[in-house]
Amino acid sequence: MTLLALGINHKTAPVALREKVSFSPDTMGDALNNLLQQPAVRGGVVLSTCNRTELYLSLEDKENSHEQLISWLCQYHQIEPHELKNSVYWHQDNQAVSHLMRVASGLDSLVLGEPQILGQVKKAFADSQNYHSLSSELERLFQKSFSVAKRVRTETQIGANAVSVAFAACTLARQIFESLSSLTILLVGAGETIELVARHLREHQVKKIIIANRTKERAQRLANEVDAEVITLSDIDESLSQADIVISSTASPLPIIGKGMVERALKKRRNQPMLLVDIAVPRDIEQDIEKLSNVYLYSVDDLEAIIQHNREQRQAAAIEAEHIVQQESGQFMDWLRAQGAVGAIREYRDSAEMLRAEMAEKAIALIQNGADAEKVIQQLSHQLMNRLIHTPTKSLQQAASDGDIERLNLLRESLGITHN
């Protein structure tokens, strides 16, 4: 039995190719069933996200297995093999185990340490459970990988520092203000970045969120999700004085918030400090605003500096995480190798049980026919001893005859022979 991980990801293939080999949730059952029909496949899990498509498999035989499965992947998605040739990778046994643990821990992600991938791996595992495509080895491997991912996040700082613009903006706000629970925050725009910012802020239970957008309709959906008030861009001048923090990200070609607008807001606020974070390109907030007292203005470049520093911290945490993966993958492989002896142990025990039953049956019959019980027991013990030592004795003699000292010593050790 061997384990195999095979696939493509954001590092090896462009999005155009990743799209071609992705698996939709609607077809996952069919894909797993089809995969199990392939020669030597004992179990399989398909992980398909926007950044990767990977097959995790337990196989009866590893001979040319990755080539056969690459062919299956091409046939299933109706693409030519040459399209995958330079993009596909595969890992066997220990490397496959380490790879899954790294993936689940966010160590192989586009954004190092991102937590979403663990949920996606768990979903792939659940699909395989639902469609009965798991082997016992894969089930054990995935469960182990989940515990490794949890250990990585608990014992390292891999997820502690912001590495996205949205998260960095929220981190900056928390650094400047001790608590966000008493603050009003104005978000300008309603695109993807502002959506992420709004969700991060809601998690920190801010007092109030106001969303300003060109059209109220687009902003209303997000407002409903995070319990926010919606205004139009033209209402910003009137509402700006309420805001302790302003985070802006629109596609406007011209600034939306000018120096005069902020001066009026500060006057109404009696010069209480304001934090303005401009993550738009071109900028939404006039740069001259940074000259005003009690105003802290940060641009996307300032956030990038924070993000780069945090990336470096995550890289340091990733080194610790890699040590955890190395340790845990080694332990899993010890368990997996031990499973290779389970069948042999079971067969050996069954053989011994058959011998015991056979000898006991003969002894009982002799005693029932009037034979002396003590003589029967003596005879039985000698016969049992001879039967049990016959095969090991022949093996020892053969190893000695062949001059195979290594095998001879191994046999001696396994039989508990400690003296020459």
Swiss-Prot record:
Record CDD domains: NAD_bind_Glutamyl_tRNA_reduct (cd05213)
Active site location: C50 (nucleophile)
Pathway info: Porphyrin-containing compound metabolism; protoporphyrin-IX biosynthesis; 5-aminolevulinate from L-glutamyl-tRNA(Glu): step 1/2
EC top class, as a word: oxidoreductase
Residues annotated to bind substrate: T49, C50, N51, R52, S109, E114, P115, Q116, Q120
The UniProt record lists the keyword NADP: yes
Entry similarity comment: Belongs to the glutamyl-tRNA reductase family.
Name this protein carries in UniProt: Glutamyl-tRNA reductase
Source species of the chain: Proteus mirabilis (strain HI4320)
Gene assigned in the entry: hemA
